[in-house]
C-alpha cells in the first residue's frame, strides 16, 4: 500500500515553489548512516516503499531503518479524453517534494559497507541522484 496522509485539511493544493536547498531534515538525526539527495524532484509513496523494501531485503532484517520523508502533497489528474475547464481533477496520488540535501533514509546497527551497498541499491529505485553520508566519528 502506498504512503498517503490519513487526513488532510485541504483536499487539493497548488503547485508551489521548488527552489532552494533543504533547510530542515538535512542532517542525520537517528542513525549512523544516511541517504542524502543531491538533486530535486518529486518522490511518490510507491518509490519510498520500493526503496524501503530494497534496503530491508539487502539487510536481511538486521539493523534499524528510519524513513525521513513522507508524501504530503496531493497530485491531481484529469481523466483521459476530457475537455479542458470544468475545474481541477481528482487527487491521483501524493508526493514528497525532495530538495537537494534532504536526508531520505537512515540506518543504524549495520556495518558501513553493508549500509553503503543497501543505499546504492535503493538509489537505483529513486528518480534523482543521492549520496551516502555517515555520522561524524562513524567507522566507514
UniProtKB/Swiss-Prot annotation:
Disulfide bonds: none annotated. Part of the 50S ribosomal subunit. GO terms for cellular component: cytosolic large ribosomal subunit. It comes from the Bacteria. This is Large ribosomal subunit protein uL16. Belongs to the universal ribosomal protein uL16 family. Keywords: Ribonucleoprotein, Ribosomal protein, RNA-binding, rRNA-binding, tRNA-binding. One of its GO terms (molecular function) is rRNA binding. Binds 23S rRNA and is also seen to make contacts with the A and possibly P site tRNAs. One of its GO terms (biological process) is translation. Coiled coil: none annotated. Residues 1-24 are annotated as: Disordered. The keyword tRNA-binding applies. The keyword Zinc-finger does not apply.
Amino acid at each position: 500500500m502506498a504512503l498517503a496522509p490519513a487526513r488532510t485539511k485541504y483536499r487539493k493544493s497548488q503547485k508551489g515553489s521548488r527552489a532552494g536547498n533543504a533547510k530542515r531534515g538535512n542532517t542525520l538525526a537517528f542513525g549512523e548512516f544516511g541517504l542524502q539527495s543531491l538533486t530535486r524532484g518529486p518522490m511518490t509513496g510507491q518509490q519510498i516503499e520500493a526503496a524501503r523494501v530494497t534496503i530491508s531485503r539487502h539487510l536481511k532484517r538486521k539493523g534499524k531503518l528510519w524513513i525521513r520523508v513522507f508524501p504530503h502533497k496531493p497530485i491531481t489528474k484529469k481523466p483521459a479524453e476530457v475537455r479542458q475547464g470544468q475545474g481541477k481533477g481528482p487527487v491521483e496520488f501524493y508526493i514528497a517534494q525532495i530538495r537537494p540535501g534532504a536526508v531520505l533514509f537512515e540506518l543504524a546497527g549495520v556495518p558501513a559497507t553493508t549500509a553503503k551497498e543497501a543505499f546504492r541499491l535503493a538509489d537505483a529505485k529513486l528518480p534523482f541522484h543521492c549520496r551516502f553520508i555517515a555520522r561524524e566519528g562513524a567507522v566507514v
